[in-house]
């Protein structure tokens, strides 16, 4: 499994097939990506300039809302993940 560094988190976005009203299945690159995902890995936290460590505010298993254009898609072991900084997370969904 990937282990994020610094203040990064790794998200797993569920891939859903989208069908138009006319029954046409849209290719994944033609669909707008959702801005919600599940946290699958969290770093140990970021280190401040004075050396103090700030623990992450999310944990593995949390469902989160994130900025639409945040992060980098990474393919690993046949799966696509999104790696982003914790500051790009907007909310945890209960």
UniProtKB/Swiss-Prot annotation:
GO biological process, one term: chaperone cofactor-dependent protein refolding
CDD domains documented for this protein: cpn10
SUPFAM superfamilies: GroES-like
Protein role: Together with the chaperonin GroEL, plays an essential role in assisting protein folding. The GroEL-GroES system forms a nano-cage that allows encapsulation of the non-native substrate proteins and provides a physical environment optimized to promote and accelerate protein folding. GroES binds to the apical surface of the GroEL ring, thereby capping the opening of the GroEL channel.
Protein name stated in the entry: Co-chaperonin GroES
Cellular location(s): Cytoplasm
UniProt GO molecular function: ATP binding; metal ion binding; protein folding chaperone; protein-folding chaperone binding; unfolded protein binding
Signal peptide: none
InterPro entries tied to this protein: Chaperonin_GroES, Chaperonin_GroES_sf, GroES-like_sf
UniProt cross-references to Pfam families, sorted A to Z: Cpn10 (PF00166)
Subunit structure: Heptamer of 7 subunits arranged in a ring. Interacts with the chaperonin GroEL.
Main subcellular localisation: cytoplasm
Any single Gene Ontology cellular-component annotation: cytoplasm
Keyword annotations of the record: Chaperone, Cytoplasm
Similarity comment: Belongs to the GroES chaperonin family.
UniProt source species: Levilactobacillus brevis (strain ATCC 367 / BCRC 12310 / CIP 105137 / JCM 1170 / LMG 11437 / NCIMB 947 / NCTC 947) (Lactobacillus brevis)
Parts of the chain that traverse the membrane: none
